[in-house]
Amino acid sequence: MLGEQIGSGQGKRTSRRVVAVEPVFKVEVSFEEMDKMLGIEGMNIGTYTSSPRPDGTLAGEGQGVFATLDGQTATWKGIGTGQLKPGGAVSYRGCLTYSTTAPKLARLNLIAGVFEFEVDATGNTQTKVWEWK
């Protein structure tokens, strides 16, 4: 069951590159967002790769770091499924795990997050994360 929303952010895709073409193509994407996690403002920087599946959906996995404005950090890893949308937009749904030694963010070590990640046709990103109870 979904619990409370624990995070949200908006930002921009910062790079894209093809990292494989066989047996199917794989694209690596990086992004930066100004986020709020557990009510704490900071920056989220992430990179994910995605490849098409036979049915046309996307399989993706990624990793990144959330840094509070005072320098405390938490890393994350995620996996998800996505779909291409008109104009090159992409929509993903998936789950996240976290790791941190930062006192402010320690609760993340006990959380599995469920996310929505949207990238519009111009590269603007939007993320929402809920606690999975």
Predicted region positions:
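Beta-strand-enriched cores of mature, soluble protein domains
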Residues: M1-K133
